[in-house]
């Protein structure tokens, strides 16, 4: 069975919710999907000041921390994190910086890649974050699998490059059923690639 590692940084819980659902969808499609988190030494502070963080704090902290060895064992890597000023979070960037030695030995070359983000209120802002994650994957020689265009969905405003969730003020808008349908379509595409 092919392995898919879903690596999240979640503050308000939305990236965790999306990653958990994506894990479930990939498992339903016969993929060994595993969920990991990047280190966030300040998450407890957010949990004490922001109710949305507190809702999923224990669940997020229970996830195993990701390491570069996890990436090496993966056939597909999916990154998910909040958008900060059109970019990835500092915590996700800190983890990605640890992967620099992997560019030299090209050990991630030809692995599949996908990504998603949760942002305040702009698909355009989220699309910039997706581009930053895709740029990292391309630097590693990975093969990006885009969300693409899905005419079978009644309504879809996703960028073709990945999934963007609009979380609203303080990340209080949780992923909707419509986003769930979009993620199901993405999981169909991703699982088809990884199992070929």
Regions found by a protein language model. Give the residues of each.
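Short, glycine-/small-residue-rich phosphate/pyrophosphate-handling segment
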Residues: 109-155
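N-terminal beta1-alpha1-beta2 submodule of the flavodoxin-like/Rossmannoid cofactor-binding fold
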Residues: 1-107, 153-157, 164-196
